[in-house]
């Protein structure tokens, strides 16, 4: 039973690392409901950033125009 649990944990960890964003390329700030948030940026396609908010779970695609000054992504993509 212990080996089965360990095997399941390894599979889950590798699935998370396989399907989750890989490398943080830069950080960006965005406004939502008049509050400025900081997010890790993983990728860019056209005018969209793949971001994951710091202090939150999950990631999403957001337009570059959604972000405010202070991001560190200039020259990265």
Curated annotation (Swiss-Prot):
Residues lipid-modified (N-palmitoyl cysteine): 16
GO cellular component, one term: host cell plasma membrane
Residues where lipid is bound covalently (S-diacylglycerol cysteine): 16
Gene Ontology biological process terms in this record: negative regulation of receptor-mediated virion attachment to host cell; superinfection exclusion
Keywords: Early protein, Host cell outer membrane, Host membrane, Host-virus interaction, Lipoprotein, Membrane, Palmitate, Signal, Superinfection exclusion
Localization, UniProt: Host cell outer membrane
Membrane topology: Lipid-anchor
Induction comment from the UniProt entry of this chain: Expressed early during infection.
First and last residue of the signal peptide: 1-15
Cystine residue pairs: none
Coiled coil feature spans: none
UniProt function note: Inhibits of the adsorption of T5 to its FhuA receptor. By this means, T5 within cells excludes superinfection by T5 and other phages using FhuA receptor as a ligand.
Protein's recorded name: Lytic conversion lipoprotein
Organism listed in the record: Escherichia phage T5 (Enterobacteria phage T5)
